[in-house]
Amino acid sequence: MPAQRPLLNLADSSVSPARPADAPNLGVGVGLRTSHYAEVLERGRRGARGESGDRVDDGSGAQAVCVTSVGVDWFELLSENYMVPGGRPLRIVREMQEMFPLALHGVSLNIGSSDPLRPAYLDALDALARLATPRFITDHLCWTGVSETNLHDLMPLPYTDEVIEHVAARVRRVQDRLGRRIALENVSSYLSFNDDAMSEWDFVTAIAEEADCGILLDINNVYVSAHNHGIDAMKYIDSIPAERVFQIHLAGHSTSGSLLIDTHDHPVTDVVWTLFERAIKRLGPVSTLIEWDDQIPTYARLLEEADKARAIIERVTGWSSGSPNASVSSSSKSRTSESPGERRDVTA
Amino acid sequence: MSLHETQTAISEWVRAPKGVAAALEEEDASSPQRESGRAKRRLENLIRSDESLDASGRLGIYANAYFSRILGVLRADYPAVVGMIGDVGFNDLVTSYLLVEPSRSPSLRYAGLRLADFLSNHDAMARTRARWPEAGDLAAFEWARIDVFDAADGPVLGRELVSRLAPEEFAELFLCLGEWVRLRAFAHPVLQLWRAGTNGEIPRFQGTSGEAHVVIWRQDEKVFHRSLDALEEAALAKLSLGSRFDDLCEWAAIELGDEAAPGQAATWLERWLSDGLLVVA
């Protein structure tokens, strides 16, 4: 089992770069889950009626959004859950789109596969993007199936020049099809290849540079993979080019024997918060998302995690409501003063 | 190894029904050389081992996740079938199913698309069918409920619109069933079995054999179903192809006689409008 290393020396981190125009800092968001639909939409509707929260111009010119009534600045939708013909899923997308900034996060782009790209999948994603008008479209730097058979898992790729060339060419085609840049997330992995010719961070960076796409930096995945492969999580965080980081993900993990597993069924761990702080010190305020996919807690509990992320961003960068970097913001100071479990909607 | 060869090997090992170690042994046994340990060396040449876990153990994490993830989704999709054939039976069913019908869709939503057909028709399921002859029908019914949940939306023909039309205007409308409506015929009484299965009882065949005609639909984002008599089933089948209401009434007159047909057609129409089954083609 790899020895855990001391993780932090914040003093050596550098100043935040300017954000790319297509990767605005949206603030802190959460992944929307079915069990929270009713509460989120009701809070949003109350906010839209002016009963709570702020109506904030998010800078997109598309619509005013109401964010503070829900305690976060934006939501992420899992793309495949909404790539269906109709019914409740698409009604949820329409309602969410009217009220909140959204991101679409996929798990099945299969960008690293040796199979051809699937036009039908890209058509469905494009159709969903037209409905959701997301600020980001993201997926994972991995493969999920081959020979038209899906494993429904985020399988790691060999870190070689050939794979970089292969994946980057596919990312460019996807971006051409969607008419925008996407961001790819580093995945948690439990195996690595003898053919690996570089570090994971060099691999992630090379693809982002070669394809001119963004990186969705999942801090929990950095930590999980670093633990599982005996690599240096701090060096990983420090090596990712800041201007390529479009978004950050935070989640919890579990232990299984000698390995860590990216289960998204626990709170974010202390060591991941510490790594996040290091990342934010270096990157500046970046759109940050809390993921919680299994053993899903109450919405209020999820907001506690979001508030922790917000507090770190504010403390490290000085970013807050009204900050020039914040295209969407919220009155987090009011929120963080509330007791856990007794959260009320906030009127700024 | 090329990327394709690497991914193909990993995919086969991960999807092997008895786990990675058994897959390696089977690979050796089926190779022309029958050389023991050859497949393991191939795996170890590809995937790094270290002091914490060897290559087979690391790949095994993905293999376990593959099966448990899909099993979890299918258990949620087919709760009454699980209730009928039990946890062990359902695990065996999913193992066999994935061998023949690996997931072809990017979304887990469609992983169970062919389960009912597999259960009803595949040779590998002959013993299961002999013990639970109704399981295939039950699976088909449960899948239809999933299918209508997120079927395409459309403008429902409501009572309000109909009440604003003159009788002759309504008679000219070409009516269809909405995309969110399914008509299904079963050889077994699936509704009783499904009710038992979803109430935590073990669905058992009660000897009430006989065809069941069922309509399944979505209304206000909820999924509904009800049984149909043969005549209403036939009427809805006509509407599924598109028909003017007048033509339907003429057909009903042939079936029921001139006296009974108008009243029956009006009753049907009232119910169909109330259930939100109809659209104007």
Predicted regions and their residues:
Chain B
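Short, functional C-terminal segments
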Residues: M1, W143-A196, G200-E201
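Low-complexity, glycine/alanine/valine/leucine- and proline-rich hydrophobic stretches
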Residues: F174-L241
